[in-house]
A protein has these predicted regions:
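Class I S-adenosyl-L-methionine
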Residues: 2-8, 64-74, 82-208
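SAM cofactor-binding core of SAM-dependent methyltransferases
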Residues: 12-64
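Structural recognition of the beta-strand scaffold that forms the well-ordered cores
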Residues: 13-15, 76, 124
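Generic enzyme active-site microenvironment
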Residues: 37, 58, 76, 118-119
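Glycine-rich, N-terminal phosphate-binding loop of Rossmann-like dinucleotide-binding domains
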Residues: 79
């Protein structure tokens, strides 16, 4: 498992990065530094190159040699939701589907063993694959907490219900709550800090 360097701050790696929104939130709350990202879409990759000059983009995660990927303290991933979403085909997390990229992510976690993992997907994951994700993380030794949050919970004018999953390895120590600086950049962090502070309450878990 990656040893966390408290003096240098957390290093982060990002899988299925997209335009990097999840990473912006995690870095804003935790002060983490993005060491590398992995995004194959050329348009999103152009955004990342402009936003994070000098940060290597590892590209297609299905083509990665995980043994050659630099270890980091924290890995984020917001993998494709098409087969999980209620508006999609409903295949869930199965090999050969877009949402089946979770299987590739899990293989990467098995090799890299970061201290922390932060995941995001549509709230429908609760009934279309959450058990698989939690089981895979548990098999790797992670303690996991999750919560469903709407964009409107942070003041946005739209619903956009999403599930956020935080996995911590027991060897990492006291957890991430101490790393979350309430004064960082004035960012709204009700949801993220709620996950860091402890398990979600029943109201958060059962939102439709």
């Amino acid at each position: 498992m990656t040893e966390v360097n408290d003096q240098a701050g957390l290093t982060a790696g990002s899988l299925c990065t997209g335009y990097g929104g999840l990473d912006l939130a995690v870095m804003a709350v935790l002060g983490a530094r993005l060491a590398w990202c992995a995004e194959s879409d050329r348009h999103a990759a152009a955004v990342l190159a402009a936003r994070y000059p000098g940060v290597p983009n590892l590209g297609d995660i299905t083509a990665l040699d995980w043994a050659a990927v630099p270890p980091v303290d924290l890995i984020t991933a917001g993998w494709p939701c098409q087969d999980i979403s209620y508006s999609g085909p409903g295949a869930g997390i199965t090999k050969g589907t877009r949402s089946g990229l979770w299987l590739t992510i899990a293989a990467g976690l098995r090799q890299l063993r970061p201290a922390y993992v932060f995941l995001e997907n549509v709230a429908a994951l609760r009934t279309r694959g959450l058990g698989k994700v939690l089981a895979d993380l548990a098999a790797l030794g992670y303690d996991t907490q999750w919560a469903c949050l709407r964009a409107s919970d942070t003041g946005a004018c739209h619903r956009r219900d999403r599930i956020f999953i935080l996995a911590c390895h027991p060897a990492a120590g006291a957890g991430l709550a101490a790393a979350a600086d309430p004064g960082r950049r004035g960012v709204q962090r009700r949801g993220v800090r709620g996950i860091l502070a402890g398990p979600p309450g029943p109201a958060e878990e059962t939102r439709p």
